Amino acid sequence: MANADSLDARAFSYAPDASFEVIIITNAPNDHDGYLELNAAARLLAPFQKNISALWTSAAPSHKLVRNNKNYLHVFGLFKYLQNYNFNAKPHPPEYYTVKSVICDLIAGAQGKTFDPLCEIKTQLCAIQESLNEAIVTLNSHATAEPAPGAPCDARELVETLHSEYSQKLTFATDTILDNVKSIKDLVCLNK
């Protein structure tokens, strides 16, 4: 049984809306047992596991921890729910990356990389810039290509289609960034 001084309850944050309660038990230097609160584990594993209700009942007794009337699941208990996930599936759901981070952090006994909202916005801006650059290259290549005689309508339709497609992508990305900026503003206001 772990020493009471070695039990460390904390919260790991991975996104503006993904904060998980964890318990880290330090057995020895560089030897940690990480436990994730059961409801957080259920939310996190929902895209990968259809029967989340069995999460606690099917866990090995050594993977269960009850503290302050809350149930916690050991990091090793999370692995079996990923065994049927197709890692070749693209694109991965956002939870895929969060699960990987949670598992690494629970094994290490500390959160390795905290969520940085500004970094998230920068990443989204870079993705928008790449998308716009692709659109510009495509439009430029079509503009410089000589249209076949009698095909100006086809070229016009192509340009209109490309314009519509990239306008939708830009609108979606802009809305996402605005939502994140609003979340950051809310977080800053809460911290004051």
UniProtKB/Swiss-Prot annotation:
Alphabetized UniProt keyword annotations: Capsid protein, Late protein, Virion
InterPro entries in UniProt: Baculo_p24
Subcellular location: Virion
Name of this chain's protein: Capsid protein p24
GO cellular component: viral capsid
Record keyword Protein biosynthesis present: no
Family: Belongs to the baculoviridae p24 family.
Major place of residence: virion
Extra remark: Expressed late in infection.
